[in-house]
Amino acid sequence: MPYSTFRPELMGRARLEPSGRVEAGSWQSFTLVYTAGRFGIDDTGSLKIGFRFATDFGPVQFTDPKAPGYTTAEASNGATLELKWEFKRNIRPWSRSLYIGVVKEFLAPGDSITIRFGDRRQGSPGIRVQTYCEREFEFKVFADPIATYDYVALPESPRIEIVPGPGVRWQALLPTRVRAGEPFAFALKVDDKWGNPSDLTNEEVTLKASSPILGLPETTRLVGGKFGARIDALKVEKSGLCHIDVSDTSGRLLCRSNPLEVVHPASKLVHFWGDTHGQSNETLGTNSARDYFAFGRDKAHIDVMGHQGNDFQITRAFWKELNRLTAEFDVPGRFVCIPGYEWSANTAVGGDRNVHFRHEGEAIHRSSHAQITDAADMADEGADAHDARELFKRLQGRDCVVAAHVGGRYADITFAHDARLETAVEVHSAWGTFEWLVRDALEKGFRVGICANSDGHKGRPGACYPGASFFGSYGGLTCFLAPRLDRDAIFESMRSRRHYATTGNRAILDVEARLAGPADVFAADPATGDGPVGTANRLIMGDIARTRQSEVELSIAVAGSAPILRLDLYDGLELIETVRPYGEADLGPRVRLLYSGAEYRGRARTTTWDGGLEVHGNAIRRASMINNWNLDRGIKEQTETTLNWKAVTTGNFGAIDLWLARGTEGSISFSTKPVSGSARIAGLGTDPLTFEAGGLERHVQLMRLPDTMTECRLDLTRKIPLRPKGDTRLYVRIEQEDGFRMWSSPIYLIRD
């Protein structure tokens, strides 16, 4: 780490009260006492107490002694101190930091500074602890005793362990598609209010399947000290859809599992869920890489994982450790673990790319060695790839795949793309939703699949809640269509683009194209120069084919994890049709106000939608919020006719549903900083009324919905004419009532 290493043992010491185990998201008051070391602290010298980049600890403030986060500092000798709460003014990963400057007088050796985070002496409720769990949450203390602004980390900094709170949200997880007669597992867990799997639940529950599942007990027990329950060796003998309802012993429904489809034993492809993009505390994440993989396997219950640390922080030792861990965790038939890294270049030279290797032991080509300073680690600097074109050149002939994504910095796929290596673009992560990246690829004529991942920094891959900071979305998942669960099969799924993306839910999606005659099918984009590998008249998502036919029959089947709101069918950039499982006659006294979009593509993309609405000539019977992941936000005030809320989006969307007392009488008006508007309620229908708000795909929409929605399945078939020349690129986007979305990878049909 590029801090000064000058005599850390002489820099002083720090202690913290209380220490030990602290509940995530709880309100606390911490007292940190720093005692000056051999040099004291000179006039204009300072301390920094650093916190990791992703943390939502705090925020710290100094002006209101009765408000949350009030923080004070006092010098034992009366020296005057200056306090600042800074973001990105400390070297990563300790990006958030409290600056404590000695601005008058100085500290002698043995003098102390007492810092109270969440000082309750004048009425503050304290400071909120980070909302996600961490084995060692560190108050990282750096000292600049000689006033050089060259900080030295203390040899030991205070730390606490952040643990989950009581469970409040039950989750039941099944696979999405299995073959009849093949064994599978059912997982049950309870998350606390911030999305951490809780080990505090001790309760017996009943399990009821919608169709027979061999080996499923009538009851199971969650035991305190364990993070849920898992039942293995289950089987279903007959094809069809099923789910499991979980109830308490009084019969109250706690949760319903995602849908499971049991298919014929001879079915070629089944479904596996993955999150291949996130990182741990060796780079910019939370908890160790071992903890990271274990969480995805044992607490999120996903099938496929990758680790994507920022390359300019990955030392040779950590690269070896990552490869050792992926080899250890990778167990064919149980869990696929993929080695890789995030090529983390600036957007100007290509932007972020995920690099996934099929095998361990590959060389890493970093975008730079920006935070790697050890001389031994600098030995391979000559292998760096400073822009995306150079990256693709260095990866030629390597057994790997690449995906473009949007994180803090975003990928510019128009700067460079390799048709053989770059097989996907990431449409969604905890950073937000980025359909513009898909459109960038389609505008350039690239033939890529669509994936989604968490890009998580909070140690919760596969179940990544954004917490209370600047992350705006629940993390995404990718469903891989593969014949079996092993690394070779998953890599084939990646290379053939046979996967679909979701914003974190587990639902079933099939897209199939049928042609009247055989088409030439390509494994790789023919832009690579590769020829066809066979012929077929039946194609699925991700397939690329050349055909002489003039039309295709497209079949789409969806089994949602919640009722389906709409399905949008696209040919590349063109919306062909929107299908809803309801019509105008089904609409009830329910209005949805939807807000969506971002400021722009870069890091400061967050749009604040804090606002209010008023119903005129009607009354609000009930209201709820969609896609509100931050408990600090949400509906804040509600009367019979008014409602105020706090919300943000980062390219994704949120919504407020109103159930009205008097049908379609009256009107509704709303006001937010980006846009305001009004409409007659009777004038609203299934098609949204849109109020544009500038920025990046930013708008508010008003629409009416059925009072109650129950239809979780949607099946349709369409005959679609193919473009006379070039590509027809068919894919769908599905939106559920609860706000989750899905995207299929396109089917590419080429006519010369």
Model-inferred region functions:
Residues M1-E17, A153-W194, S198, N258-V270:
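Short S/T/G/P-enriched beta-strand
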Residues L173-R177, K193, S210, L216-S267, ...:
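C-terminal functional module detector
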Residues R316-R324, Y341-W343, A348-G350, N354-S469, ...:
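Domain-core and long-helix interface of multi-subunit machines
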Residues M1-R169:
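Ser/Thr/Pro/Gly-rich, low-complexity intrinsically disordered stalk/linker tracts of secreted
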Residues L32-R38, F117, F186-V190, E553-G560:
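Aromatic/hydrophobic beta-strand junction motif of beta-rich domains
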Residues G240, C255, E261-G397, S493, ...:
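A metal-dependent hydrolase metal-coordination microenvironment
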Residues G20-W27, G40, T176-E182, M541-Q549:
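Short, solvent-exposed loop/linker segments at the N-terminal edge
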Residues S26-F30, D43-G45, A180-A187, S239-L241:
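Short, solvent-exposed loop/turn segments enriched in Ser/Thr/Gly
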